[in-house]
Regions:
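Extended, folded domain segments that form the structural surfaces/walls around functional sites
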Residues: 32, 74-76, 84
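DNA major-groove recognition helix of helix-turn-helix/homeodomain DNA-binding modules
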Residues: 85-103
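Short beta->alpha connector loops at strand-helix junctions that form conserved
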Residues: 78, 104
Length: 105
């Protein structure tokens, strides 16, 4: 019995997607945060991570400086385990050049 030759399985190398690499303009950054606020308004940790993504896109060192925080404090506050105070969120938003706004539900 003759065996049919088989092709070796090709392995595809993947890399994790990092949204911060794709946030290039202030408009893209604002739209990204707005999407989080619109789609997951009760997900405080997700919104904090979104702020962290934008901060990484802009440069954590500069954002921390502009927010009056240490770089380490900024990373910690905006990490998945972080729980930033509202004051910190406001400082970071100002440093990022984005505004949080309210509208009637």
């Amino acid at each position: 019995m003759r065996k049919t030759p088989t092709k070796k399985a090709m392995k595809t190398k993947t890399t994790p997607y990092d949204v911060a690499e794709h946030l290039r303009t202030p408009e893209e950054m604002a739209a990204y945060l707005d999407a989080w606020l619109e789609e997951a308004p009760d997900d405080a940790a997700g919104i904090a991570r979104a702020l962290g993504d934008i901060a990484r896109a802009k440069g954590m060192t500069q954002v921390a400086k502009d927010a009056g925080l240490s770089r380490e404090s900024l990373y910690r506050a905006l990490s998945a385990e972080g729980n930033p105070s509202f004051a910190t969120v406001l400082k970071v938003a100002r440093a990022l050049g984005v505004k949080l706004h309210a509208e009637a539900a």
